[in-house]
Structures are given as structure tokens and as C-alpha cells.
Amino acid sequence: VDAAVVELLSSGERFREVVRYLMPGFYLGLVYGFILYLGPSLGFPLIPLPFIDFTRFTSAALPGAVIGVATSLMPWVGGMVVPLGISAVALATSLAVWVFGNCLALTNPALRSLFPEWAAEYYQGMDLTRVLQRSQVRVWLPVQIGAALGFAALVLLKYRRAVAATGRALYLSLKGGGGGSSLPPLRLALACYLASTSASVAVFHYLMPHFPVAVPLVMSLLVGTLMGFASASIVGESGAGFSAPGFLWHTIVYLTPAPNLTPQEAYSVFVYPPVIAGSMTGGGAQTIKAALLTGTKPSDVVKVWVIAFLAGTLVNFLSLDMFWRIAPIPSSAYPSTVVSMPATAMIDALLVTRGLRISPQMLAGSAAVTVALAAAIEALGRLLKVGVSASGLMIGLFSPPITAIPMFAGSALSSLVLRRRFGERWDQAKNVVVAGVLLGEGLAATVAVISLMLLKAVWLWPW
């Protein structure tokens, strides 16, 4: 797909066709984006940002339920490129978890006894942000970790032939000397990988000597390598993305007995892990393949990555300094940080202090249930010959209705209305239309942020 996009944009005639579909979406996103983002910048929001909260209105009938819809166009139009079967499974899972699951964890005596902290912290009238943060930390985080582990195991099992083929190809390449006209020698690449990864483990152990060194060694050299193989193999065979489950390192640390850690080490071991490869391997391999298909040297791609990393790091430092001079982070000056950063801080604090209820039994149970449900969904899809996928199960587990509802609405509009109305023309144009909408809204958001920074620049602190 990436190579096709490059070829498309390189063709003058086809580029004009793309622009014909791109610009209507761009203008729609630009106009809506200005209405959405400039209002808060000027002090009188016309549309609630980032979502419309219905939780307070439904708390009497469904206590603890997370109910709301995003006001950004991103999940709405993004759903247009998601197959209807996947979005339907995602919506059903999201409602089952974040609406009915949250409610039952408060009202059902048996479930209430399993999550006493959630029952103690909830109160009538709690807004959506607090309900989402508290329920994720007190109820769903251990379940999500176990489910991610189970789903990762299922994906590896499903694509075991591709992963095995990758291993055989790597072995044969090493045996034959590796390398090629456009790629560096494989032995050199492997030596660089092992050296840098081992150096990361050595630095980690030097800074945290009281933590068992076997854990970072296994995670970096074994698990990271296997995850990289799996990610590249799965992307190459199916195009589907795959990465290590979230909080994998945190879970391993949580379950590892290390009584001699100092308070500083007890915190640092969670938030400063060694290098664990695999999360970006699939995307990187896909980019290199697209470069080869379009006649681009892979070495040039690596140079661009290095330059972009260095430039991005410099810009990030300068931007962070400027933002902190304008206002504290998090604060009302940066609305999204008020939603996201407290939840992240709570999760870090509860992990470090062992305040979460994470047990091998809970992880194994949620992993087993996830594997069973995913296998049942895949079997049902093959039996009924409908396009449902177990990936929707994971999307719904990690996506509250704020985004799951708009995603399903966009997918239904695309599949049931626009495709029937415009036929193949819509299939050819939808990606470009969606890109145009996101481009327009992104430009409006950028202008709004710049305007907000200029308006608040008078807050600059003297240091």
C-alpha cells in the first residue's frame, strides 16, 4: 500500500484525481475543525471538546457506565476504512466492558467483592473522565494486560508458519554470508543489534544492581527478538499490525520478587526499562520493503529516520520548554493533559507501590477467556461467511464507547450507504476522502494551538 501511494503521488494525472477527492474532505475538516478548536481558544467553546459526556445523565440507571461520543472527526471518518464486521465486534465489546461491565462491577455483589476499590471510589454524578480513569485502573487494567498476552499468543499461533519461515530465512542468510546489493550484511546488522541491546541491559543493571539481571536479559535479547520476528512476519504475510502487549514489562517487574530494591530503584525499574525491540519492527520492515519497490535505497530511509529523530528530539525539548513557560503541565491550558496525564500518573503510582491487584491467576484467566472468545469469533465468521474478526475484540476492550460508537457509525455509513450509492468509486476514493478530512481538521487544530499559545504567551514565567 505504501509503495502504491508513492507511485500514485508521482503520477501527475492520477495525482489530479486524488486532489479531486481530497479537497472536499479537506474543506469539511477545516471548517469543522475551526468551529471545534477555535472556540475553546477564544474562551467560548461552541462544541464540547474532546467529547460529549452523557455519563452524569445515565448514572442513575447505569451507575459506573462510560457513555459519551467524541467530537473530533477522527474516529468518525476513521471508521469509514474499518470493515463493518470488525467495528461491530469492537462496539459490542466496548459496550460490554465499559458500560455493562462497569455497572455490574458496582451492582453485582459477587463482582463488587472482586473490585472493592472501584466500589469505594465511585460516587453518583462522577463525570466521564473520572469514571474512565478509575474503572480502568481498578477493574480493567489487569484484565487488559492478560487479554493482550492471550491475544498475542493466539496471533503468533495463527501466523506460526510465517514466523517459522522468517527464522529459516534468517538462518540461511547468516549461513550464506547474508547481505545484498542494497542492504548491509546481515551479520553486521545482527552484531549491531546484539551489541546495542546488550549495552542497554548492561546500563540498566549498572543503574539498578539489586534487580535480577536475568529479567532484562530475557526480555531484551529473547522476548524482544521474538516479538520483532513475529511483527515483521505477520505484517509481511497479512498486512496486519502486531506489537508486544502493553504493560508487558511492567507486569513482569510486578511479578518479580526483588525485596532489596531501594525506593529509587523500585520506581525506576518500572518507568525506565531496557531496550525491548519488536514494537516498531513490522512498520520498519514495511517501510524498507516500500523503499525497495519504489527504487529508494534502504540506507537513505535509515538516514531519514536518524535525521528525523535528532531534529524531533531538538524540537521536542524546545517545545516542552516553551509550553512549561506558558503554563504548568497538566493544566487547563492544555485540556487533553487533564484527561490523560492523571490516569497515567495513577497507573504508575499503583504499579510502583504494588497497589494493583495483579496476580498470575487473573492474568491467566483473562488470557484464556480472550483466546476462547477470539477463537469463537473467528469460527463464527468462517461459519456464517461474514467479515468479523477477533481484532475487533481487542479494539473494543481498549476503546471506550467515546471512540467505539463513532467508529461503528463511520463504518456503517461507509459500508451500508456510501458503498451502495457510489459502488467501486467509493472504494477507490474513501481513503483519500478520509485523509482530506483529517488533514483539514489537523490544520485547524494547529492554527488553534498556535493562536492559544500566542494568547497565553503573556503568562511566560521569568525562568
Q: Language-model segments: what does each one mean?
A:
Residues 1-463:
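Alpha-helical multipass membrane-protein architecture
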